[in-house]
Swiss-Prot record:
Disordered, as annotated region: 1-22
The protein's name in its UniProt record: Probable transcriptional regulatory protein Saro_0419
UniProt cross-references to HAMAP family, sorted A to Z: Transcrip_reg_TACO1
Domain of life: Bacteria
Location(s) in or outside the cell: Cytoplasm
Keyword Oxidoreductase annotated: no
Keyword Transcription regulation: yes
Organism: Novosphingobium aromaticivorans (strain ATCC 700278 / DSM 12444 / CCUG 56034 / CIP 105152 / NBRC 16084 / F199)
Keywords from the UniProt entry: Cytoplasm, DNA-binding, Transcription, Transcription regulation
């Protein structure tokens, strides 16, 4: 029955992947709808909507799903979501910021607090950790668009503030480029970069840590579990942290 068992395992993994993909599309749709409701339903006139659509495209979200999310907003349909932010500490003293879109603050707050409490962390008050981060715009490209020098040159020309490149080591880790810009310049810089690097995988507001906290083997697994639990919550859009897990520790985690 080994073959049958293997088939079941494959189907289980596929089911889990499909579920995760569906949840991701749901979050992307929510952001598109909120962005369209807050501004014009035309992405050329609404930078936040344009960024949300780009993020959806980067995750291969079907065009019909994107169109439905915009249409829902333009007709005033769907739930009204509120932007909320939670701050706290994870295992090893790692500072964590959680951004969510919710139609029920009490539900989301309870879920986030429980996630922290059950995974070695604790939820703090508003402003508890954000002072250790800088609010910036973030433009993301895959490593394949060019080497560090090419991307750095394009970023400087476009008006970016900083570039962090990881060129990867093969198909499983193709690398990426993170281009940091001032919040007010985000979409202007993104448009300039499109001329030389093409359309970005992600254009969004982000929290960049001023300093990073190194995480040891004792805390790394619990920290990653906390982040997974938070990201799996339907209301949570993004989780930011100031952690740095060394490569040798990541290897021991498999």
């Amino acid at each position: 029955m080994a073959g049958h068992s293997k088939f079941k395992n494959i189907m289980h993994r596929k089911g889990a992947q499909d579920k995760k993909r569906s949840a991701m599309f749901s979050k992307l749709s929510r952001e598109i709808t909120v962005a369209a409701k807050m501004g014009m339903p035309d992405p050329d006139m609404n930078p936040r909507l344009r960024a949300a659509i780009n993020a959806a495209k980067a995750q291969s979200m079907p065009k019909d799903n994107i169109a439905r999310a915009i249409d829902k907003a333009s007709k005033g349909e769907g739930d009204n979501y509120e932007e909320v932010r939670y701050e706290g500490y994870g295992p090893g003293g790692v500072a964590i910021i959680v951004e969510a879109l919710t139609d029920n603050r009490n539900r989301t707050a309870t879920n986030v607090r429980t996630a922290f409490a059950k995974n070695g962390g604790n939820l703090g008050a508003s402003g508890a950790v954000s002072h250790g981060f800088e609010r910036l715009g973030l433009i993301e490209y895959p490593g394949k668009v060019g080497d560090e020098e090419k991307v750095l040159e394009a970023a400087i020309e476009a008006g970016a503030e900083d570039v962090e490149s990881d060129m990867g080591d093969g198909d499983e880790n193709p690398g990426s480029h993170q281009i940091w810009v001032a919040v007010e310049s985000l979409h202007e810089v993104a448009r300039e970069l499109e001329k030389t690097l093409g359309e970005a995988e992600g254009v969004k507001l982000a929290w960049k840590p001023s300093m990073k906290t190194s995480v040891d083997a004792d805390n790394a697994a619990t920290l990653l579990k906390l982040i997974d639990v938070l990201e799996d919550d339907d209301d949570v859009q993004t989780v930011w942290g100031n952690y740095d897990i060394p490569d040798d520790v990541m290897e021991t985690l498999g």
